[in-house]
């Protein structure tokens, strides 16, 4: 456990921050995680790191007290996705995601697979990747605005038993109106300063903007992992979250 434990989180409070551990290997990941505090953030492992390190690193991080978002974006036949979700639940994973475009039967199978667990992972649907624009959707045969496709897939995910969706912060407000206050909205593309940002996530917002728009969790990678003082960044985002909640 990191010794720099803060008193931020009470039973009535939660941190909205999910730190994306976009490292290439276990050594760099564990070296960085020593700078974090499990009461100030959740953490996320994606395809590159999980492929490189496998289950052992994920379980090590969970054993250190972190809530883990396993970001593997499952998209397969219903049985395969259901079995993968059961494995994630057995590991103690806090959140796992899948492409909502995999369809109702796939998502319902996933929800049924983890329903019997006392503490089950949150099941999150991936709607439209934040790197995609309308021209990208058109190239795959979807002549629809990204925000319309997000709402369509989010409604499908909710009615199929999922707990929430990944969406850009710009879609958070309309999704709140459509799907209610209890549906989880996980928002990537969060930057401390959006000015001059030209990275691979097109629809970005600051933490304050995203929380005001209705996001539940904020995925932050480089703004935390490349910060001189990651804990200071986390404390500031959590301070903003408290202001938005009050």
Swiss-Prot record:
Its GO CC terms?
Answer: cytosol
Q: What is the name listed in the Swiss-Prot or TrEMBL entry for this protein?
A: Orotidine 5'-phosphate decarboxylase
Q: What is its EC number?
A: 4.1.1.23
Q: Which reaction does it catalyse?
A: orotidine 5'-phosphate + H(+) = UMP + CO2
Keywords from the named record: Decarboxylase, Lyase, Pyrimidine biosynthesis
Concerning PANTHER family, the annotation shows: OROTIDINE 5'-PHOSPHATE DECARBOXYLASE (PTHR32119:SF2)
Per the record, the similarity remark reads:
Belongs to the OMP decarboxylase family. Type 1 subfamily.
According to its UniProt entry, what is the function of this protein? Catalyzes the decarboxylation of orotidine 5'-monophosphate (OMP) to uridine 5'-monophosphate (UMP).
Per its record, what are the GO molecular function terms?
orotidine-5'-phosphate decarboxylase activity
Q: What GO biological process terms are annotated to this protein in UniProt?
A: 'de novo' pyrimidine nucleobase biosynthetic process; 'de novo' UMP biosynthetic process
Q: Could you tell me the superkingdom of the organism this chain comes from?
A: Bacteria
Q: What class of enzyme is it?
A: lyase
Protein species of origin: Neisseria meningitidis serogroup C (strain 053442)
Which Pfam families does this UniProt record tie to the protein?
A: OMPdecase (PF00215)
Pathway noted in the entry: Pyrimidine metabolism; UMP biosynthesis via de novo pathway; UMP from orotate: step 2/2
Catalytic residues (UniProt): 73 (proton donor)
Positions annotated to bind substrate: 22, 44, 71-80, 130, 191, 201, 221-222
Its quaternary structure?
Answer: Homodimer.
